């Protein structure tokens, strides 16, 4: 399963950590240079209203959630 997360803050990091042994892949979209979730997973630097990257998450992920 592939999960997209809008926002790469501490909640996103805790979500990623809770699925570490569950064979779940994450894609995180966050506008900051080094969000907390980037310690564990690849983060895409983009604004939350960037249509191109929102479309990418919608197409690539089985589910998308929000971290804020």
Question: What are the language-model segments listed below?
Answer:
Residues 1-68:
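ATP-binding N-terminal substructure of ATP-dependent carboxylate-amine bond-forming enzymes
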């Amino acid at each position: 399963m592939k999960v997209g997360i809008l926002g790469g803050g501490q909640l996103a990091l805790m979500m990623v950590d809770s699925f570490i042994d569950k064979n779940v892949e994450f894609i995180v979209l966050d506008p900051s240079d080094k969000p907390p979730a980037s310690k564990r997973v690849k983060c895409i630097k983009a604004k939350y209203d960037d249509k191109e990257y929102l479309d990418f998450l919608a197409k690539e992920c089985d589910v998308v959630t929000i971290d804020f």
